[in-house]
Amino acid sequence: FAPWLKEQGFEVEISNSLDSYLDLEKLKKVDVIIQVYTQGTITAEQERNLLEAVKGGVGLAGWHGGLADSFRSNTEYQFMVGGQWVAHPGGIIDYEVNVLPEKKNDPIVQGLKDFKMHSEQYYLHVDPGIEVLATTTFSGEYAPWIEGVVMPVVWKKYYGQGRVFYCSLGHVAADFNVPEAREIVKRGILWAAQASDK
């Protein structure tokens, strides 16, 4: 999404280290943090700065495990994100993503219809306070005890003054070849960055 962000007028900085979170003053000046970091650890100072920046109004956006399976031991981080990955029954499977009819006018999903995916169908533990925009329903084929469970796929929320956007799609970059998936993430990033408000 970096080239697209540049086209939108954002100055983009890419970092391969969580040490980017050590400079709190710099963090506080960005519009949005897009984190892609899975199954790792974060130091107390890195986490404290990230939480403070978002709480103070910096946007946070991400997808798949890069945001919802980053730091399994950090519950305040999970509270900020709004959920934590726990399983993807069946691995790579075919499933449908359903845009909630009552959210059809939300700018992140407006004009989009339900769509098919061939990827991991995330089962998450989610905060009941999130604003769900799209869901998926588990068939029960790979875990019979969850047949019919409706799971959030796309949500937004606030953490302090910061906007947080999450999408569970995106196991591989090719998942974003699905136009609806790509559009949802683009719009979600802009919402988190408050770009439409400026």
Provide a role label for each language-model segment.
Residues 1-69:
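Helical hinge/lid and interdomain linker segments adjacent to catalytic or ligand-binding clefts
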Residues 7, 140-151, 158-198:
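Extracellular ligand-binding/catalytic regions of CAZymes and related secreted enzymes
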Residues 29, 45, 49, 76, ...:
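Extracytoplasmic/secreted proteins, especially bacterial periplasmic and envelope-associated proteins
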Residues 40-111:
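A glycine-rich, often tryptophan-bearing local segment used as a flexible ligand/cofactor-contacting loop or short
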Residues 77-84, 115-116, 123-130, 170, ...:
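Oxidoreductase and adenylate-handling cofactor-binding alpha/beta cores
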